[in-house]
């Protein structure tokens, strides 16, 4: 199975540092079946691809993420052969070995990701609206082909992941859960294929997590991985308030996810 990972990049010094961390860790030498592309906006009317970076003709800021996504997928559809397209960002770690050997978990006629619920009402989307989080959208060819027909200007002011979920839902696609680990949410490292390492409080912590998680997955033995797992947790304890409450919240969240699948 051929996989293309499209990472939303740009938007400031912090994102630049996160991208560099990705380039020297998990994305440094991907297997031939997996291609990693960083996606940026630029002035002008042309698409430019260089050094695994795709520049698309739109603004390179937070409010243009949906437009950038649509243009990026449009280019990939025309220039790459793939079975699975993953849209993500620069603060996410992917275990490419697991990704490359876990083909059976991906439903190419549906859309995969991690479900979340909105915390407030956003236009016609009520509080509690259930959607796939944008840090990992797993799209087969049918879904990616549908997305390039999406008109981004009809979703102004709506978060890109809610807009994408709503559009694909109205197009008749079904959705399925792909578990991820979010270190900033509960500070407990679960070695999944996708690990969200973003820190909202300390920019340097995102990079430290990227490095530590990468070292874990490079371990060749159980003891090596155990010791490196401990290093990840020690880093979380040092940099955050890891408590029994956070562990309890993590377990409750996992239980709720299973009930909602």
Identify the role of each PLM range.
Residues 1-20:
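N-proximal low-complexity "stem/linker" segments adjacent to membrane-targeting elements
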Residues 4-8, 36, 136-138:
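Conserved, well-structured core segments
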Residues 7-9, 40, 88:
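Short beta-strand/turn micro-motifs composed of small residues
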Residues 18-34:
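Short, acidic, metal-binding catalytic loop of nucleotide-sugar glycosyltransferases
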Residues 32-43, 112:
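Short, hydrophobic beta-strand segments that form beta-sheet elements in well-ordered domains
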Residues 38-82, 96-97:
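Active-site-proximal specificity loops/subdomain of glycosyltransferases
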Residues 66, 84, 88, 92-166, ...:
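Conserved catalytic core of nucleotide-sugar-dependent glycosyltransferases
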Residues 154-261:
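C-terminal catalytic/acceptor-binding lobe
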């Amino acid at each position: 199975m051929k996989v293309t990972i499209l990472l939303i990049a740009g938007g400031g010094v912090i994102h630049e540092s996160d991208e560099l961390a990705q380039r020297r860790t998990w994305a440094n030498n991907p297997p031939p079946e997996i291609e990693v592309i960083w996606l940026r906006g630029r002035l002008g009317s042309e698409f430019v691809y260089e050094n695994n970076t795709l520049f698309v003709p739109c603004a390179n800021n937070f409010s243009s993420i949906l437009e950038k996504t649509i243009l990026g997928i449009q280019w990939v559809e025309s220039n790459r052969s793939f079975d699975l397209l993953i849209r993500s960002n620069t603060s996410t770690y992917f275990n490419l070995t697991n990704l490359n050997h876990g083909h059976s978990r991906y439903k190419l006629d549906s859309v995969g990701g991690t479900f979340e619920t909105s915390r407030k009402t956003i236009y016609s989307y009520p509080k509690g609206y259930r959607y796939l989080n944008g840090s990992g959208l797993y799209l087969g060819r049918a879904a990616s082909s549908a997305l390039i027909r999406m008109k981004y200007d009809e979703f102004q002011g709506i978060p890109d992941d809610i807009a994408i979920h709503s559009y694909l839902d109205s197009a008749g696609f079904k959705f399925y859960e792909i578990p991820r680990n979010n270190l900033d949410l509960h500070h407990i490292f679960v070695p999944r294929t996708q690990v969200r390492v973003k820190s909202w409080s300390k920019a340097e912590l995102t990079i430290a997590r990227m490095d530590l998680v990468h070292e874990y997955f490079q371990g060749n033995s159980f003891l090596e991985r155990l010791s490196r797992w401990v290093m990840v947790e020690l880093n979380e304890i040092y940099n955050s308030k890891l408590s029994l409450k956070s562990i309890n919240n993590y377990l409750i969240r996992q239980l709720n996810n299973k009930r909602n699948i």
